[in-house]
């Protein structure tokens, strides 16, 4: 399944970057390092005032700047994904005429399968793999919603505790536990789905794990009231999260 996904992604990606990333570890690592260094340099030269007598996250990294960055990144990624999806549609459906109303009536099936991926349960007798993936996706989408849609409330300025942290704890627990389990499964190679792993398979899990870990570490030092530790962990967290 992973091999098929990589091949299809490389076929429909008009930029050619997917093919380069999948065929060259140097390209993948180079791109990640470039983006990470770019984030670090942005904060080195354009951060706000550094207040050390108390935690002041929004002074160091104004939430409006972060929100604009989130939206810009989401727009760029959406543009790439949608353009590739349109390209895939043209390749597959160019000679097939489908009534427009059928797209409307089948939209619910698309949404249902996107959210639940229920057809995965039909692959073999073991349902635990589907359940783990479903829980992982729920944690990932929860965290994405917090940092993109609700960043104004999720990014707390001082060392106080905010109720949105409850959702962050859920996402953190899910992402850490499931990624560690996936690491173990790929190392032991007991399941056929994890018997053969490419570099990109490992890389995504590593980035997801350390994005989650640095996020909860930043939260911990902020709650503890350590200003410099909070700012440093904030930059490290984004340097890992953005390349992912």
Q: Residues of each region from the PLM?
A:
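Alpha-helical transmembrane segments with an aromatic anchor "belt"
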Residues: 125-131, 160-170, 183-203
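Hydrophobic cores of alpha-helical transmembrane segments in multi-pass inner/ER membrane proteins
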Residues: 70-83, 174-179, 240-244
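Hydrophobic membrane-spanning alpha-helices of multi-pass integral membrane proteins
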Residues: 137-145, 169-181, 200-219, 236-242
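Extracellular/periplasmic helix-loop-helix junctions in multi-pass membrane proteins
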Residues: 156-162, 217-240
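Juxtamembrane/interface segments at transmembrane-helix termini
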Residues: 80-100, 181-196, 220-228, 244
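Iron-sulfur-cluster electron-transfer modules
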Residues: 1-149, 156
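Alpha-helical transmembrane segments of polytopic membrane proteins
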Residues: 67-72, 166-172, 233-238
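Membrane-helix exit/interface motif
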Residues: 146-157, 179-188
């Amino acid at each position: 399944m992973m091999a098929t996904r990589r091949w299809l992604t490389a076929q429909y990606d008009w930029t050619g970057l997917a093919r380069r990333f999948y065929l060259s570890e140097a390209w993948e690592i180079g791109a990640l390092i470039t983006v990470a260094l770019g984030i670090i340099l942005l904060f080195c030269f354009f951060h706000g005032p550094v207040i050390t007598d108390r935690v002041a996250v929004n002074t160091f990294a104004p939430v409006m700047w972060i929100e604009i960055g989130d939206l810009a990144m989401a727009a760029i990624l959406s543009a790439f994904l949608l353009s590739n999806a349109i390209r895939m549609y043209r390749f597959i459906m160019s000679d097939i005429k489908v009534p427009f109303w059928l797209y409307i009536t089948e939209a619910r099936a698309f949404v249902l399968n996107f959210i639940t991926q229920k057809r995965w349960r039909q692959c073999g007798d073991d349902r635990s793999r589907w359940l783990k993936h479903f829980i992982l996706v729920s944690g990932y989408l929860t965290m994405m919603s917090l940092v993109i849609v609700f960043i104004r409330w999720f990014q707390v300025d001082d060392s106080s505790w905010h109720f949105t942290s409850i959702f962050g704890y859920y996402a953190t627990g899910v992402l850490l536990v499931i990624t560690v389990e996936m690491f173990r499964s790929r190392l032991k190679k007991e399941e056929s789905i994890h018997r053969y792993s490419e570099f990109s398979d490992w890389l995504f899990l590593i980035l997801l794990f350390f994005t989650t870990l640095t996020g909860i570490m930043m939260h911990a030092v902020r709650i503890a009231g350590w200003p410099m530790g909070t700012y440093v962990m904030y930059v490290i967290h984004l340097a890992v999260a953005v390349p992912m």
